[in-house]
Design a protein with these regions (language model features):
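N-terminal active-site wall of soluble small-molecule enzyme domains
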Residues: 1-55
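Generic structural signal for well-ordered alpha-helices
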Residues: 2-6, 28, 49-53, 73-76, ...
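Hydrophobic faces of well-ordered beta-strands that scaffold small-molecule active sites
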Residues: 13-19, 39-41, 61-67, 86-88, ...
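Catalytic cores of alpha/beta
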Residues: 23-33, 70-83, 126-143, 157
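Conserved, mostly hydrophobic/aromatic
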Residues: 31, 86, 112, 124, ...
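Glycine-rich phosphate-binding active-site loops on the catalytic face of alpha/beta enzymes
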Residues: 39-48, 87-97, 138-159
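C-terminal helical cap(s) of enzyme catalytic domains, especially alpha/beta-barrels
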Residues: 54-56, 136, 150-168
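Glycine/Thr-rich beta-alpha phosphate-binding loop at enzyme active sites
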Residues: 69, 77-110, 114-116, 154-161
């Protein structure tokens, strides 16, 4: 790889990097070089929206914009329109597993659907089989669940249970 540092098997595995960093627009190219095929950028972390859009579109990489439950997604409609997907945080304290799902996300989902019809919407945090089913019914296309899967006696069965929800 000529001295380049990349995540293992990035030529075969699609890696999603969830950038929980300030001013990500200054380093986006670095994450692609590390092997990311998809980036999640938290709206609150962007310092310069114009520079961010210039940099992210130049990379020709799949990207999504993430929002906390306290964010007013309607204020970010321009970014939502341009993003490949939207990720909503189902919890307020980002980075801590095992938290209770925040129902404010349900309103955010509806607002996203009004801003961008057919949007790919992901929810990360507070996800269990019940909340995943509820979210699927209102149009959420992806869920991210850590503690329910990794805390299960058999994580493979837990993953299959989540997959079955998408077939309902």
């Amino acid at each position: 790889m000529d001295g380049e540092i990349r995540v293992p098997c990035s030529d075969k595995i699609k890696y999603e990097f969830d950038l929980m960093v300030m001013a990500p627009e200054t380093d986006l190219r670095k994450y692609q070089k590390l092997g990311a095929s998809r980036l999640i950028i938290h709206a609150d972390s962007i310092d310069n929206q114009e520079l961010f859009l210039k940099e992210i579109t130049s990379l020709k990489i799949e990207w999504g914009i993430a929002f906390k439950t306290s964010n007013d997604v309607k204020k970010w409609s321009d970014l939502i329109q341009k993003a490949n997907f939207v990720q909503l945080m189902g919890i307020e304290n980002i980075g801590y597993q095992g938290q209770t799902f925040d129902p404010r996300v349900l309103d955010q989902v509806n607002h996203i659907k009004q801003i961008k019809a057919g949007a790919i919407i992901s929810v990360d945090g507070g996800i269990n089989l019940e909340t995943a089913h509820e979210l699927a019914q209102i149009g959420v296309t992806r869920v991210v669940s850590g503690s329910v899967v990794f805390g299960a006696n058999n994580p493979s069965v837990s993953i299959e249970d989540f997959k079955n929800i998408s077939n309902v």
